[in-house]
């Protein structure tokens, strides 16, 4: 009997890999001879590197890069087991969590470090990059990332500009002649789960600026800057950058990746599941087990468990979802391929205790689910 275990992380409690181990251990008490395939997954955000490295037997590359406020930070990216794909989280180099709350300022923050990670991957002869762009501290339109790869942003006097949100309004022209030529032979996929455009009421400044420390005045300045940036990009590339879905993601990194990296912008879970080859693993399985910290009505909006379920249903394999919490509207997930859902919480407890006991609770829940399946196998109509 083949059982595929493919959970996302339980945030602040368990990594996706540890979730796999706990579920496998629980099921193994009842089904010790089953063939378990563990594929820790992620949706393109935090934890994607760890999940992809664990799922493929890859490794982590560490290096020092320029942080969002210009300081040096220790960053990382992942290499898949075959050595052919780099998995980069923008947050590792340009993340909001790298900046103390009192120092957050998207007018000054730059995505330069993310470009350094991409450049390092190219130096290692990588020709396929998965770039997760969640959790950034920046609203620089991806200027910093592009600058690290050779793009120059000039003001009206032809002087080079520092790449940050405050200089978006000063961009008069863009020189792309010295953009790293290796990008032409590198397939880059951007894991993006929002469709916000670059500018406007749903744009990078209005929606994401306040999350990164922008005051209302900063939001207005950033919006005006992005409007100017968009005009220059459109004039020079003839790409309708204002209407591109996902262009405003990560403070405009979406649009920069599309324009300067020729990247494909896709739902993160779609990229990850293709990369770990979930479809091949699911074929012939008796059961698929997925999960994450919370399963509720929002899960149907494209979260990792629904992505797993959609693949499993292509092969008519039943799916069980396990979560820390089952929230309002959880029953909707049954319409999208998750056949049964379970919470791991044995009782009400303080949050700190719940997070600390996640591994034990997940093991116990997996064992109980396995017990129920074992009982069901013996019940006859």
Swiss-Prot record:
Optimum pH is 7.0-7.6. The keyword tRNA-binding does not apply. One of its GO terms (biological process) is organic acid phosphorylation. Divalent metal cations; Mg(2+) and Co(2+) are better than Mn(2+), Fe(2+) or Ca(2+). Disruption phenotype: Loss of glycerate kinase activity. Inhibited by EDTA, p-hydroxy-mercuribenzoate and iodoacetate but not by NaF. Keywords: ATP-binding, Kinase, Nucleotide-binding, Transferase. InterPro entries: Glyc_kinase_flavodox-like_fold, Glycerate_kinase, Glycerate_kinase_RE-like, Glycerate_kinase_sf. It is an enzyme of class 2 (transferase). Induction: In glycolate-grown cells but not in glucose-grown cells (at protein level). Signal peptide: none annotated. Pathway: Organic acid metabolism; glycolate degradation; 3-phospho-D-glycerate from glycolate: step 4/4. One of its GO terms (molecular function) is glycerate kinase activity. It comes from the Bacteria. It catalyses: (R)-glycerate + ATP = (2R)-3-phosphoglycerate + ADP + H(+). Its EC number is 2.7.1.31. The keyword Nucleus does not apply. Its cofactor is Mg(2+); Co(2+); Mn(2+); Fe(2+). Belongs to the glycerate kinase type-1 family. GK1 has a half-life of 92 minutes while GK2 has a half-life of 11 minutes at 49 degrees Celsius. NCBIfam families: glycerate kinase, PRK09932.1. This is Glycerate 3-kinase. It comes from Escherichia coli (strain K12).
């Amino acid at each position: 009997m083949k059982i595929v275990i493919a959970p996302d992380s339980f945030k602040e409690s368990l990594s996706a890999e540890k979730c796999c181990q706990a579920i496998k251990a629980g099921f193994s008490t009842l089904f010790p001879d089953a063939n378990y395939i563990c594929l820790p997954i992620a949706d393109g955000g935090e934890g994607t590197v760890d999940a992809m490295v664990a799922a493929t037997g890859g490794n982590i590359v560490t290096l020092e890069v320029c942080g969002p406020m210009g300081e040096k930070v220790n960053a990382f990216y992942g290499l898949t087991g075959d050595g052919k794909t780099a998995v980069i989280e923008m947050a590792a180099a340009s993340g909001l969590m790298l900046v103390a709350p009192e120092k957050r300022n998207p007018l000054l923050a730059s995505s330069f470090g993310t470009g350094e990670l991409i450049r390092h991957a190219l130096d290692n002869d990588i020709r396929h990059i998965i770039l997760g762009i969640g959790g950034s501290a920046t609203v620089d339109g991806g200027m910093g990332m592009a600058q690290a790869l050779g793009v120059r942003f000039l003001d009206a006097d032809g002087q080079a500009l520092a790449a940050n949100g405050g200089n978006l309004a000063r961009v008069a022209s863009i020189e792309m002649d010295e953009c790293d030529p290796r990008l032409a032979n590198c397939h880059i996929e951007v894991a993006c789960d929002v469709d916000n455009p670059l500018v406007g009421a749903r744009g990078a400044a209005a929606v994401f600026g306040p999350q990164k420390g922008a005051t209302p005045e900063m939001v207005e300045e950033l919006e005006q800057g992005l409007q100017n940036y968009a005009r220059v990009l459109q004039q020079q590339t003839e790409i309708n950058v204002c209407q591109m879905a996902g262009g405003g993601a990560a403070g405009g990194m979406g649009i920069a990746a599309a324009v300067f990296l020729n990247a494909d912008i896709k739902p993160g879970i779609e990229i990850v599941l293709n990369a770990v080859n979930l479809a091949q693993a699911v074929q012939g399985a008796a059961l698929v087990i997925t999960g994450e910290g919370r399963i509720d009505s929002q899960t149907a909006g494209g979260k990792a468990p629904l992505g797993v379920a959609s693949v499993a249903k292509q092969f008519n394999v039943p799916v069980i979802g396990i979560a820390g919490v089952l929230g309002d509207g959880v029953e909707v997930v049954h319409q999208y391929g998750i056949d049964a859902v379970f919470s791991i919480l044995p009782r009400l407890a303080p949050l700190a205790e719940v997070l600390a006991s996640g591994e034990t609770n997940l093991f116990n829940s997996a064992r109980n689910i396995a017990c129920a399946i074992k009982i069901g196998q013996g019940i006859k109509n």
